[in-house]
Regions:
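Flexible, low-complexity linker and terminal segments
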Residues: 1-9, 133-357, 362-363, 503, ...
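Thiamine diphosphate
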Residues: 1-136, 164, 226-228, 253, 392-526, 536-537, ...
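Short acidic, glycine/serine/threonine-rich loops at helix termini
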Residues: 35-38, 61-63, 84-88, 110-117, ...
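A glycine-rich helix N-cap at a beta->alpha junction
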Residues: 44-53, 94-105, 183-188, 446-459, ...
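Short beta-alpha connecting loops at secondary-structure transitions
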Residues: 46-47, 105-110, 126-131, 278, ...
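Conserved thiamine diphosphate
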Residues: 107-156, 162, 198, 345, ...
Length: 597
């Protein structure tokens, strides 16, 4: 064994390798991205690593490998589980052979997600087990246990770290070396692996019986613990358990119960923990899952227990908890004097720093070109998930809607059908196009919609950490592969008008938008320019004495590198990348520098 200082996601990855991992597939999404990347950093024989085109594809790749007896890991953030839910629901009925663990990282807050959905609820819905680690150390061990339970009960298993567990750091003991599992291979059996209604009917009954067995098994699982004693009990899971433990470390006469396996609920374990208890506080983030389970249990066994939590208003219904929030909740519950907290009344307020597109980001130029071309015309601007969602910020104000990955393309079609006078735009990044955009384009062509697809191609998956995708020409196994051409895909689908333009050429970009806006049908503009974070900046721009202080550059493009200094427009050289967009909009040609050299 050796010590490694790793973040929670790294601990999950190393734990999976220690469990004999054979294959990992996933799709990047905060807070889960580093899991798969960590596996890729430790090259060894017998493990296939891939960023799949989306979460559904990742789930299906892993499923067939599991059918062959291999141990497989699937990684995603919680909203990715929605995308993967179709195969996952069926997998719960069909079952697996080799251990299969699906990491679905929840995001209380949310900090970087569309929703505050709870993977524990999804596990209940799918009727499969879920593990809920509290720390990176626990995550390292629990992911290994999850593989064992998966193989023992022939079921996929969910693993649910939250953002604070994923991104926490800890020094943990890990194995010196790993060995991938040796597996039998796929054994053909159509009565087992081909899903039919009759098989689903029989397996549904088996699943319910199996879950009772798993719940009983979880009752003796080492991570489900009871500490202390008393008539009052605090039930917690995940990071909330750490907050509770911190508050209660010197508090006598209270039980602290950790539920590390929320589903199937360890009923007998909890029933025993409730012996002698009259009041319960359920400390948990997102849904009142544990609270509901204890209420169900109290009703089933006619227990006279006061159960408190989210549904009684004691715990916030939304947002993440913290040590201070948990302390306040538990002090109220236990009638304790609230713990003293650091006085920050005299501390200066943190500066407001709203998220913005980077200085030199080509997406800013793409949005500005469309805005300039459509000035005075009724338009709809449908956004998508990625850095370019920040196009909604002032002064660009170029994202009217954002729902989920790929939705911008199909939502633009909906706007067309209810308002044929408007010009309907869909903005989608190159990675999102491959993940969930192509079917939307097929739908547009098939139904003869009138819309303009703007593919913001910056040659990476920027927002989640610059992961490769099918258009980059490389994969996570370190191989150079053929690039999938977005233009050829669009041509194959049947898009008749396709224009590729450098968004940093403002005149050409505006002309392309105007041309497409006057043509009926499905049109596509590929705004192609690399992400400024992965390319060498051109240099710095400068502002000459010709500047008339009209501030058009500040009012219209919102680049963070253009600032006011002593009341005058200036360039922040620490941020400027020399993209030259500002020089192209200056009415008096006062901005020069890198782009003109």
């Amino acid at each position: 064994m050796r010590k490694e200082y790793v973040m929670g996601n790294g601990a999950i990855a190393l734990g999976a390798l220690a469990a004999g991992l054979n294959l990992v597939a996933g799709y990047p999404g905060t807070p889960s991205s580093e899991i798969l990347e960590t596996v890729a950093k430790y090259p060894h024989d017998g493990v296939h690593v891939e960023w799949s085109v989306n979460e559904k594809a990742a789930m299906e790749v892993a499923a067939s490998a599991s059918y062959s007896g291999a141990r497989t890991l699937v990684t995603m953030k919680q909203v990715g589980l929605n995308v993967a839910s179709d195969p996952l629901m069926s997998l719960a009925y069909v079952g697996i052979k080799g251990g299969m663990v699906i990491v679905s990282a929840d995001d209380p807050g949310p900090i970087s997600s569309q929703t505050e959905q709870d993977t524990r609820m999804f596990a209940d819905f799918c009727r499969i087990p879920v593990f809920d680690p509290s720390t990176p150390e626990e995550a390292y061990q629990m992911i290994q246990d999850a593989f064992d339970y998966s193989e023992k009960y022939k079921t996929p298993v969910l693993f649910r770290p939250t953002t604070r567990v994923c991104h926490a750091y800890a020094s943990i003991e890990v194995k010196d070396e790993w060995k991938a599992k040796e597996y039998e291979g796929f054994v053909k059996d159509s009565k087992k692996w081909v899903i039919f209604p009759r098989l689903s009917f029989a397996n549904h009954a088996m699943i319910e019986k199996r879950n009772v067995e798993i719940g009983d098994d979880f009752g003796s699982y080492s991570m489900n613990t009871v500490e202390g004693s008393g008539s009052k009990a605090v039930f917690a899971s995940g990071i909330s358990y750490c907050y509770a433990k911190e508050t209660l470390k010197n508090v006598p006469d209270v039980k602290l119960v950790r539920i590390a396996t929320p589903h199937p609920f360890p009923e007998q374990f909890v029933k025993n923990a409730l012996d002698g208890v009259t009041e319960v506080m359920c400390l948990e983030e997102l849904s009142p899952y544990i609270e509901n389970q204890i209420l169900r249990l109290a009703g089933k066994y006619h227990m006279d227990i006061d159960v408190r939590g989210k549904q009684t208003g004691d715990v916030p219904a939304s947002g993440e908890l913290s040590t201070n929030k948990a302390a306040d909740i538990l002090c109220d519950f236990l009638d304790l004097k609230k713990t003293s907290q650091v006085d920050v009344s005299d501390a200066p307020e943190l500066p407001v720093r709203p998220p913005v597109l980077c200085a030199g980001c080509p997406h800013r130029a793409s949005f500005y070109a469309v805005k300039k071309a459509m000035a005075g015309r009724k338009s709809y601007f449908c956004g998508d998930i990625g850095c370019y969602t920040l196009g909604n910020a002032m002064p660009l104000d170029m994202v009217d809607t954002c729902l989920c990955m790929g939705a911008g393309i199909t939502m633009a079609q909906g706007f067309h059908w209810v308002d044929e006078d408007g010009v309907c735009f869909a903005f989608v990044g190159d990675s999102t196009f491959f993940a969930s955009g192509m079917t939307g384009v097929v739908n547009a062509v098939y139904n003869d919609a009138n819309m303009i697809l703007c593919v913001l191609d910056n040659s990476t998956t920027a927002m989640t950490g610059h992961q490769p995708h099918p258009g980059t020409g490389r994969n996570m196994m370190g191989q150079f592969v053929d690039k999938v051409s977005i233009q050829k895909v669009l041509e194959g689908i049947g898009v008749k008008k396709i224009v590729t333009v450098d968004p940093l050429d403002l005149e050409a970009s505006v002309a392309a938008v105007k041309e497409c806006a006057d043509i009926r049908g499905v049109k596509a503009i590929i705004f192609k320019s690399p992400c400024i974070a992965i390319t060498k900046p051109s240099g710095k721009m400068d502002i000459s004495e010709k500047c008339i202080q009209c501030k058009k550059c500040i009012r219209e493009i919102g680049c963070p590198a253009i600032i006011l200094k002593d009341g005058k427009v200036a360039i922040d050289e620490s941020l400027c990348t020399g993209c030259g967009l500002c020089a192209q909009i200056c009415p008096v040609g006062a901005i020069g520098g890198a782009c003109n050299e």
